[in-house]
Amino acid sequence: SRGLGDVYKRQDEVYKIELLMKQAKISTEMRRTVPAALAEAARECGPAAAIELPDGSIETGKTSNLLGASAALLLNAVKALGNIPHGTHLISPTAIEPIQKLKVDYLGSKNPRLHTDEVLIALSMCAATDKNAQIALEQLPKLKHCQVHTSVMLSEVDIKTFKKLGVGLTSEPVYEHNRLYH
């Protein structure tokens, strides 16, 4: 767990990095995912994320009633990589709702939205009977070395999922909620 001292240490580290970047005449906006994520967040008035795919295209994800921004981003990315139409539901909302009920009613979570690991498990279950979900699942290795930026700091579980996928991740130094611990 992180304490208040860790927050101050992190702020000092951020300041040092910002200073080094200024001296090197580089900015975060040089990563194409940064302005894309921030623009999506401004458009949606909520958390958003962007990924640069191997072909250089940018996909975004936003927070919804069902999914966190990072989970939506992963689904949009694998759809794009698998040439699956954007409007296609890889996971039925009726499949997501029981997972949300489990999280909130039985596991005590305050956040009903699916995280990245949960959405990937749901996708793998759907892949057993849905060809598009199977195609999407097969795209996951293509995410290795892709770059992601999020408009808010992520939960530990989302950070770990991106790391396991081999995705480079940065985020704005902003918490989604006014809480010290995510």
What are these regions (language model features)?
Residues K9-K16:
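Cyclic nucleotide-binding regulatory module and flanking cytosolic helices
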Residues Q11, M21, A36, I96-H182:
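C-terminal binding/interaction regions
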Residues G3-Y8:
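Short, small-residue-biased leader/transition segments that mark boundaries at the very start
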Residues I17-D117, A127-D130:
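Conserved mixed alpha/beta catalytic, RNA-binding, or beta-rich assembly cores of soluble enzyme
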